Amino acid sequence: MSDINWQTVKEFEDITYKKCDGVARIAFNRPEVRNAFRPKTTKELLDAFSDAHEDTSIGVILLSSEGPSPKDGVYSFCSGGDQKARGYQGYVGEDGYHRLNILEVQRLIRFTPKVVIAVVNGWAVGGGHSLHV
């Protein structure tokens, strides 16, 4: 992997998004919570997948994760929805609307004409398991 010159496309808080030689790499970047997703994460995933979908130079999209967890050194692909971000009536985004939009991420993954490969390096639980199959 050291020979790959990944270029950061855009800075995000919950994910990393890089490209190199026709390959896009989108990775969960919340290892402290086993890469659980929250509304902000799904918005960032939608932005990154949409960009990779529209970029004609990209043929392959890798979905992966950063890690390990600083708490115990364990790697996790994704542990699903972040239960700490879940309110009384479900997930609430920064704008106050109740939504998680992970189904939109799944739809974009399934219908993009690009090859999407899940690089599952660790636990994949709940909604995280649904993303890699």
Feature-to-residue mapping (PLM):
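Glycine- (often His-adjacent) and acidic-residue-rich active-site loop
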Residues: 65-107
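Charged catalytic carboxylate motif
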Residues: 40, 44, 101, 108
